[in-house]
Amino acid sequence: SVMGTGRSNHCMDLMGNAEQLGVDAAVTWLGTQDWSNGRVAMIGKSYDGSTPWQAATFGNEHLATIVPISGLIGVMELMWKNGSSEARAPIMHNGVYGSYGIDGDSEDIGNMCPDYIIGPGTGVAAWMWGGEAAGTYWKERYFLDRVLANYQGSVYLIQGMHDWNVDPHMAIPVINQLKDAGIESKGLFGQWDHDYP
């Protein structure tokens, strides 16, 4: 789970800098423990499948491999393709993901952060104007460029070609971009939807 979900607390900023730094800190902690061999792997599906991409953006020496299963290479890329938005684009990101940190208990206030307020506005603005209207909200949540520039580990990319949620463009041509950048990459692609193979 990510910050603000499960039994964790703190601000869940919906794949923003705080979450990315938290994931990187977890990799460093795991890689530096006495019982660790110093090599960390990350796996996850859907939102949790995006956290391995986040970790890989830092080039952390302890991150040996990532296994994103239907994970996002970027948040805006989930709902916009070739300049066109899906119908869910203006509300999906914060309407669905934003609800993860809110469960009606006394910790809700501590789990909220400024990006909860900024997010819905950026979703609507991007839907209206086709991109980043102000600030760096979407750029901060795009991972692939930093992975290609910084990551030194390997990638095992898993994606269903019938995935209606995280579309296959998050895997193809991404696997080719990874290989072109010299990142050891393998893929498992098949005829399933937003699920495990």
Give residue ranges: language-model regions.
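Alpha/beta-hydrolase fold nucleophile elbow
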Residues: 34-47
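Conserved alpha/beta-hydrolase "acid-adjacent" motif
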Residues: 164-172
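Catalytic histidine neighborhood in serine/cysteine hydrolases
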Residues: 178-196
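Short beta-strand/loop motif that positions the catalytic acidic residue
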Residues: 151, 157-159, 163
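Glycine-rich nucleophile elbow surrounding the catalytic serine of serine-hydrolase chemistry
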Residues: 44-54, 165
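Accessory cap/linker subdomain of secreted extracellular hydrolases
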Residues: 54-150
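Cap/lid segment of the alpha/beta-hydrolase catalytic domain
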Residues: 1-31
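Short beta-strand immediately N-terminal to the catalytic nucleophile in serine-hydrolase-like folds
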Residues: 42-44, 69, 158
